[in-house]
Amino acid sequence: MRCALLSLLLIGSPSLATTFHIDPVNGSAAGDGSATQPWASLQQVLDAGLVQTRDWPEYPYEEGMTLVTVNAGAPVHAGDTLLLHTGYYGDVAIEHAYNASPIIIAAAAGAQPRLRSLLIRSAQNWIVQGLDVSPSFSAPNEQITMVEVTDHDWFGPAWDIELADLDVFSIADASAWGPAEWVDLASSGVDIDAARVTLRDSRIRNVRFGIALSGDDGRIQRNLIDGFSADGIRGLGNRGLFEYNRVQNNLIGDDFDENHDDGFQSWTVGAGGVGTGEVSGVVLRGNVFINATDPSNPLRSSMQGIGCFDGFFVDWTVENNVVVTDHWHGMSFYGMRNSRIVNNSVIDLDNTSPGPPWIMVHDHKNGTSSQNVLVRNNLATDFSLDGIAITADHNIEFSNASALFVAPPFDLHLRAGSAAIDSASASGAPPLDADQVPRPQGAGFDMGA
């Protein structure tokens, strides 16, 4: 009986996942994708119908359509892995490919696959990890958006995409760049205009814009943005999760560039245009925003930390974030409702103007009051809180950072004897701190991140 049952289970089970190989140096279009006969081009595999996937039965896409199988019998199926070996892959576009379960595209062990750009459009269930993406791999180096995940009005939406362990950069070393290069040559990093997209554990450097998320339910986690001349992160979609990212080194000020640079920026768009809608359910947790790791850099800008000026921002959680900046806007929300700003640390990069930075809750630009916002357990050089039912308690406004922190402005761990130790409210305090250490560690909860 057991043998018969096992036979039935094996017959009824799906085929095991297969690993395929792509090698632009040693591969061939005539290969079979095996380790000994790899294919030569990822784009050729995608374009030649070697992936069994799904797409819409016709275009233009209309809501309610049912996906149909395309490339039936192709060697690569949902659940398989494509391993990329060292070499140059050019511009890669994944389109018209809705998988029933994820297909993984990943760097082979020890390999360094290099792409000029990556576009994922009108697709589902792809995981891309371990790749280097830069226009500097091919001459001429031109200003582009290096990684895009996007819907398409004609071909259909994209969703359920994961990007991980990417190294995305305009140029590896930008030390010789001046204002013109930072504004006109620097490419932008990752632009996500699709639902349920994750970008994690990636490095984005020497860019114009870092990460832009306008799709809903996105997850931006544990990324480093280092060297940017516009905005570090833009969060425009609903229910976006931004946690444990580090954004540092904003360059080129208003003398050369009209963009008002932000570590994190959001705004709404409604029927009446910018500032007439809502962005809801966003979580900003454990992020670090540093204007300049070298305050003497002559190219450094004056960065707004978290700048949200065209609300309403509804049901937001802003907790355990660190902002080190040379600007008045440390955290500013113009039009906020039903939200929490808890256990954040905001400090001035230096003691000169502009600054010191504040935590601000303010009226919407149309005069409508912010309402029902909790501001608790924060450490900041200034506070400016206006609105209806704004609850503010257990906060410290400080001018002498050395009395609170180990080595300000960059090491904001609390020093022994700091007034912020064991002084916070337990109510509403996050269970972890910015280092993901459980709270409390002493007799009570600590203030700040």
Q: Which residues fall in each region the model found?
A:
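Predominantly extracellular beta-rich ligand-binding scaffolds that present long acidic/polar faces
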Residues: 93, 310-413
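Beta-propeller domains
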Residues: 251, 260-265, 270-335
